[in-house]
Amino acid sequence: MGPDSALIVQARDLRRRGLSDQAEAVLRAAVRQRPDHLEAHRDLVQLVWTRTGDAAASMAELDAAVRASPDALGLRAAQARLLGAVGRSDLAHAAYESLCATPAGADPRFRMEASRAAVAHDPVAAVAHARQAATALPGDLRATCVLAEALLAAGRADEGAPIIEAVLAKVPDDQGVLALAATAWRLTGDPRYRDLYDYDAFVGGGLIAVPSGWSDLSAYLVDLVAALDRLHTRETDPIGQSVRLGTQTRHDLLRDPDPAIQAFFRAVDTPIRAYLDALGQGDDPVRRRRRSGYRIAGAWSVNLRPGGFHIDHVHPEGWLSSACHIEAPVGDDDRAGWLKFGQPGLPTKPRLEAERFQRPQPGRLVLFPSYMWHGTAPFTTGPRRLTIAFDLVPGA
């Protein structure tokens, strides 16, 4: 292991132990020693962002390295990617456009990134980048999906729909592709949209059970809140996740030994099985995968502060997804902080709005298909929202 890699390992170990100041100092030393060290820059941006939520501060060392070496295309590409990750999609788009005029632009996979950076700012450019990538990579499903996304953003859903339908025929259970197809069908008025977004059939759930060892649900939730609070140690949202103005736990809660957290996965069994029983049989993407059992595939907690929200997203690795509010106000009537469904997490022309809202209720588990666009409406005042979420996959 070289000295540069040793510094990164040291910084990651310090961060795992909660010594963020020391970890940041080590990473700053690493990028100043090797300004072209992309991994060290990425770790530093991630660390500063999660501590401050300040895009300029997070990018400062990398921006300085790019100014010092403007011909270092690897540094410039990393800068473009990370600008998007810290919420500066405008600067990311500009950086990608500049890079597309260099040899980096000859890489079709880089063109895909440039297309996704452009969709919210210049859909025409997004289509051009995506079409170039798809032409260079015939048969590449990801390139085809990027082209379809760009067409939806450009108001050309009639062209995008058959493109994504061809992909869906090859990967009929891909949750991201299902979400994209549903978006195209909604834009074109295709009745198949309602087969996928049947909210009455597919959005359900119920109160979790009172786990053994607790007298009632309120007492259990108090202990669960305390257990989760010990895990929410970062100051702001993680890079690459859907959380804004909040924190998300780093590790899989399934592996957390805390008794209150482990009890949660027993407590959700009752509403999960009731939901599966109510689904019934069918040949749609949800029911056709239904088995007698299920498996939880990853679980995490989110703590949203006032002003926080989830951007609209789907869960590509799931079959069914969930949200269970552990702590939330129960009296709001203005939908602030409510779970919402149906608003795509990608630009479309015309813009599509949410169609279904779910009021938070502590202890209530909400289940829905993993391909269904969902997020939370922003809230500016009042208490925080603390949730646990997980994905389900079919089990024996």
What positions do the PLM features span?
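Non-heme Fe(II)/2-oxoglutarate
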Residues: 195-289, 309
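Structural motif corresponding to the intra-repeat A-B loop/turn of tetratricopeptide repeats
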Residues: 17, 51-52, 86, 120-121, ...
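Structural register within alpha-helical repeat arrays
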Residues: 10, 44, 79, 113-114, ...
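Residue at a conserved register position within TPR or TPR-like alpha-solenoid repeats
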Residues: 14, 48-49, 83, 117-118, ...
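TPR alpha-solenoid repeat register
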Residues: 6, 40, 75, 108-110, ...
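Residue-level recognition of tetratricopeptide repeat
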Residues: 3, 37, 72, 106-107, ...
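Catalytic core of non-heme Fe(II) oxygenases with the double-stranded beta-helix
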Residues: 259-269, 273-367, 372, 377-378, ...
